[in-house]
Design a protein with these regions (language model features):
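Hydrophobic helical h-region of N-terminal Sec-dependent signal peptides
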Residues: 12-16
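C-terminal motif of bacterial Sec signal peptides marking the signal peptidase cleavage site
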Residues: 19-22
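Subset-of-secretome marker
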Residues: 2-8, 24-284
């Protein structure tokens, strides 16, 4: 029984990692900032001048603090790693814990259509895939599992960039319909692991350094776009390491919105017990 359950858990692959990583479980306050991300995408000489002259350290610190206050948001982007090229989207609610994420990439045995769709509501994780005939979804009970208690990924990237020795203001661009200052720099894993400053929380520092190590990356170029209201509009990270090229870029929206994340219909979802019982029957 334990061996079967272990194989069932392993079969989640990218989907399980997506849901756990994309919802970092940071300490956002309920309600968030409904006005976040409302800056105009039209060029404004006064606003653009202020964004172009913004100090990286000060603006990144402000953006990270504002980001940590957000309880809900959407992210949409692209990712390239050793598993292939993906388009990604995720709706995240920090408290109560919920997320709805989808990866679309290469077709595999676990994802024959190339789609990995994971919904997490509390201690229940729902994954797309017909593990039991006639059921479009199957579920895992995460009760008792140790979740991440670090900040949300976009806050981690922003504070990681703030630790970079070469961080700079690269100019003003339009992202997601809003004008934003583009900050860029190189984060070296060994330097980050030894960082003792106050730009990044110790837990976030350790988690991000671990993430880089798992991706086989010793250094990455990070980009963070921040609008005039101090809201993070986009993050990007790129590098080349032992596993090849890595690139990820995400845009953020709907801060503070009611995302209406819900579990799939019970009639279409196989329970963990049903999945295990079906796997046992197949092995007889």
């Amino acid at each position: 029984m334990k061996a079967i359950r272990k194989s069932v858990v392993a079969a989640t692959g990218i989907a399980l990692a997506l849901s756990l990583a994309a919802c970092g479980g940071g300490g956002g306050d309920a309600g968030g900032d409904k006005a976040a991300g409302s800056s105009s995408g039209k060029s404004d000489n006064g606003a653009d001048k202020a964004l172009g002259a913004a100090d990286p350290a000060a603006m990144l610190k402000k953006a990270a603090a504002k980001g940590a206050e957000q309880n809900t948001y959407r992210m949409k982007g692209v990712r390239k790693d050793d598993k292939g090229d993906f388009t990604t989207e995720n709706a995240v609610q920090v408290k109560p814990d919920a997320s709805d994420g989808k990866d679309v990439g290469p077709k595999t045995a676990d994802t024959p259509d190339g789609i990995s769709h994971v919904i997490k509501v509390g201690d229940k994780m729902y994954l797309n895939g017909e593990k039991v005939p006639g059921k479009k979804w199957w579920t895992l009970n995460l009760e008792g599992a140790k979740g991440r208690d670090a900040s949300e990924p976009f806050v981690q990237l922003t504070t990681a960039l703030a630790t970079a020795k070469d961080v700079r203001n690269a100019g003003v661009e339009t992202v997601g319909g809003r004008r934003a200052a583009h900050f860029e720099g190189t984060v070296v894993r060994s330097e980050l692991a030894a960082y003792k400053g106050d730009a990044m929380k110790e837990k976030d520092r350790d988690d991000y350094a671990k993430d880089l190590k798992e991706e086989g990356l010793e250094k990455v170029t990070i980009g963070v776009w921040v609008d005039k209201d101090g809201v993070i509009a986009k993050t990007e990270e790129s590098g080349k390491g032992s596993k090849g090229e890595y690139h990820r870029a995400d845009e953020y929206s709907d801060f503070g919105a009611d995302l209406k994340i819900q579990a799939p219909p019970a009639a279409e979802t196989a329970t963990e017990k049903e999945v295990i019982e079906y796997e046992m029957k197949k092995q007889k």
